[in-house]
Amino acid sequence: MAVPSGALRFNADSRKLEYYNGEAWWQIDSFTPDAATGGARGVFGGGYGNSPVATSNTIDYVTISTTGNATDFGDCYSTGYASNSCSSSTRGVIGGAYPATNVIQYITISSTGNSQDFGDLTQARYYNGGLSNSTRGLFAGGNINPAGTYYNIIDYITIASTGDARDFGDLTRIISRVTGCSSSTRGIFAGGQPNTNVIDFVTISTLGNAADFGDLTIGREGPGGCSNSIRGLFGGGGIPGTNSNVIDFITISTLGNATDFGDLTQIRNNMGACASSTRGVWGGGYAPGFQNVIDYVTIMSIGNAVDFGDLTIKRDSLGALSNGHGGL
């Protein structure tokens, strides 16, 4: 829409931009999440390591636009590992964990402090994948025991409320160690165990089963997925007998196979991944040996990851979320 000449002015008294609608001057309000929060914040919660305890309840955070070591945020209300996460611009939600639990917990991303009880998943499980838009969070797949009882369940929650998850539909396959990312309309689940290169998609605001999107460049279990509103990235993961440092990317609004983006700084799997509108970040993982490394990339470019800093403790199988990802 063209703005008529002279219809915009800056009011020196109120220090606001104003628009003239033909009868009166009106203030133009603006809001950016990054201005309100001091920059997109990435949060890493839970995990498994060897110091100071095997199962960690630690929650760390970073400011994604900077570099440097993570800072302590608080503790998980329910201790475990192999959970996954989703978030709005204000609230982060962590679902499931090992030993298999149906507990969902939440934090307020812009503050610090311990997580609180949100509700329950429809099925106790761990190594599920998570994603969200600004209002709805999804948790998919996972398993209930090391013997390999896997699920294709997709649950959903309304992030701004509390309460139990509800059934959304099913993935195209029964899978664990799956990862997720999203735009504001479409959710993507990729990889998993048993080892697969399959990528599924759903429309977040509806209910129903997932459909096939395409394939990763290689089959991987335990990759870390993150996205802005355009591009989804999948980094690392396990290939039978070894681990991977490969980063793939997709264009979320299309269908098709993933393309090579570059490499992580280390070969590792079971890391947490989160993003702002410009950067993707991976933290922790197993290489072999538990890692505290944090890597980052510029999402709309291609190339290898660069060192960001370190988590407060070494661990893998941790959840990650942000208040600036592609679903918002």
Where would I find each of the regions flagged by the language model?
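Polar, enzyme-active/binding microenvironments
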Residues: M1-L328
